[in-house]
Amino acid sequence: MAELKVIDEPVTVVVSMKGWVRALKGHELDAATLQFKSGDALYGTFACRTVDTLLVFGTSSKGAGRVYSTAVGLLPGGRGDGQPITSLIELESGSQPAHYFAGAATQTLLLAGTGGFGLLARVSDLVSRQKGGKAFLTLDETEKLLPPVLAHNAIAAQVACLSLTGRLLVFPLTEIKLQPKGGKGLTLIDLDAKDALVSVAVFGQSLWVQGTGRGGKVKEELLRSAGLAIHIGKRARKGKPIDGFAKPQRVVASG
């Protein structure tokens, strides 16, 4: 029996916090108009194509080292709530979906864990023909996987690593290896015993830092060349504290 040919067209993959997935036509989607089942909400949207792949990173008591995949072309469309991702993949016992990414086979992701290690992998490296996925990342039992970050191929791309104690380290993306077979990866940032890596970003010239300021108010600050200079170093260094924040929580690429 011949395989059903998928028409290559733009879609937006919509994923809910409780793991319901759907693919809506086009890329002109207003996320504010999306509706979900009672008690559910938006996890994220991914502008991709019907020939691309949806990756699901699972979590369990043994760490989030297993990756599952399904073809975007198999996802339901229309106006409904979609389909639970658990009907498309077979999660290992005790595991739950933790993070998602939908994109082309050639795209590269930065995968990092709270223990401070990380690696680069192409989407094609993470795809499995088995519904049970594949073991890809080596994580300690107490370590968790951070949300995967799209790594742009720009020569000047930089990596930002933010620790729980508010230290920020910035270094060239070229200092991280592409590891097609997975593993533990390289040390991204040097962490003290009680510290952890809480956020990573791949960016060009400027970086958003989000968190709480003095007095507990939500704060967001854009760091450009002058503000970033003190934090630039080599991979596996400790980085420097970020001024002006009571608790920096996230770093995000600008633009």
Where in the sequence are the language-model features?
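Short, structured "edge-of-domain" segments at secondary-structure transitions
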Residues: 1-255
